[in-house]
Structures are given as C-alpha cells and as structure tokens.
Amino acid sequence: MSHTPPDLPGSAATIGLTIDTVLRRTDKTLLARGSFRGEPAAVKYLIDPDPFWAARWRHELNVYEVFGDTTPPVRIPRLLHTDRDRLLVLEWVDASPLAVERYPQRELDTREVNAVLDCITALNAWTYPAARFSPTFDYSERVARYQAKGYLTEGQREALDSLLARCGAPAQLNHGDPLASNILLNAGRSDSDDEAETTVVLVDWEFTGLFLPGFDFAMLHTQVGASTPVIRERIEAIVSETGIEAAFALNLAVVLTRELRLHHELPEDDPTRKRCLPIIEAAWTSASTRLQRIAAARPA
C-alpha cells in the first residue's frame, strides 16, 4: 500500500507523488520507490540540514537540469519533479547496482568491465556546456589538507605539487563519485543478436564537475579494481594511450589518501575497516612509488 514516510513533506500526495517502498534511509538522505503522476519513480529526499550536503543537493539538481537541456552521451534517469529544496523525483530505472559495497567482493565479467569503461570514457569525452560546470575541489588545498592530517609525507607532497604544476587547470568532466553503488547495470537483449546487451546508468551526481584527467578512472582502479584486476589493466592501458600519466598518478593519490582517512576513522573492530584497509594501504604503497617516479622524470 502506498504511503508517505514521515521524512517526506505532507504535500507529496498533492503533486501526484506516492511512495511504495523505502529502499534506503541514512542520516543524509532517504531513497524510495514509488510513482509520480502514474509513472514509476525514484524519490530522493535530503534529510541532513548540514550546509555542505544542502549545497551538494543543489549541485546535483543543477546537473540534472543541465542534462535536461543538453543530452549527455550516457544513460541517466530523467528528472521528473523537484521542490528545489530537498526533493528530487527521478525516472525509475530497472537496473541493479554493480555492488552495494564500496569495495566489491565479486569480480566483474568482461561484458561489465567493457560497459563501465565505455560509459566513463564517453562522459569524459563529452563536449559539455562550459559555463555550467566548475572544478569540484581545489587540488592544492586538498593536498595541503591531507599532509596536515598526516596522510602525506613532505616528499609525497612535493611530488604532488610538482605534478600539479605540470597538469594545468582541471577541465575534464567526471562523475566524481563512481562508487559501485552509483553504477547501475541493466542487461537487456540486443536487437541484432541473442546476446544480452549491458547498459550502464549513472546516478548520484552530487560531486560531478571538472577534474584533472582520469579521476573517475582512479576511483574505479582503487575500488572496483581491488576485486577485478582486469579493470585495472584496462585503465592502465587507457592512461598510457591517452598520455595522462601525471594527472592519473595525482588523482590516484587524492583518491587513496581520502580512502585511508575514511577507513582509519572507522572503529578498529569494524568489519569494513578490517577487510578494506589492507587493500587500500597496499594500493597506496604502489601509488606512492609511482608518484615519486613520475614526479622525478623530466616532462616530455
């Protein structure tokens, strides 16, 4: 039976919104399945009044509006309704997340790897409306902050500063948060043959913006690559072919130091910390060596 959770405004029914199932509720947001004026819909409602998350919510709304004005080269849910404050009503997409864990425990098959990488590559190559996007964060500030927190040595920071000086301004559009849970897969049937055709749908655009080349790849390399070595191999090939070694090494460092912080902040007996922290530490050891090597090499 349809109902409105107490978190949602009482006016939901007056705009033709009904809620069938609450899919997930965190301290930040409520995600539900329902219908909007007879059309299946996903409902995302901001619970946390923190100004940071309010700003991210407004940013995600802006991204959906950009996509409504200028069609992106990747599949996204359509924006059906918003109250411009806390409520997003989106087209319901029949697809499943790549995984629910931040670090998936299953290995992706070749079809899934191809679909994910093709999707991210298409987004990165898109000629986006330049006036509508800006850098998601300041790389120099991020590096300084993580050194102050103890996640970077002086030598590592110097290497990162050296690469930053080479890379120029962030100008590549990236999703910004391609967690496995934000990558939905929908295996349909191809019109030309009997094989299943895997479509990727990207959701949660709160951190979308301009980055140095390869940020999304750095996240996939770190998280999905932990259980799927072939995606790391494919990403390394893309990095080499496109000549973005310095930017990618920088992005890896940014991603991995954040992962170290997030997992060190978990309780010591937390199962996720116990499982993932050794993976992250091993990846950071390798990435740090790579960083120093590239920083020491003379630019071509």
PLM features per residue range, with description:
Residues 50, 97, 183, 210-212, ...:
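Conserved protein kinase catalytic core
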Residues 278-300:
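C-terminal, non-catalytic tails of nucleotide-sugar-dependent glycosyltransferases
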Residues 4-14, 125-176, 186-189, 196, ...:
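An alpha-helical support segment within catalytic cores of ATP-dependent transferases
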Residues 27-35, 42-43, 161-215:
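Active-site acidic catalytic loop and adjacent metal/ATP-binding pocket
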Residues 85-97:
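Conserved short submotifs of the Hanks-type protein kinase catalytic core
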Residues 214-243, 252-271, 281-286:
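Active-site activation/catalytic loop segments of kinase-like enzymes and analogous catalytic loops
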Residues 41-82, 104-122:
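A conserved alpha-helical element in kinase catalytic cores
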Residues 13-36:
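ATP-binding glycine-rich phosphate-binding loop
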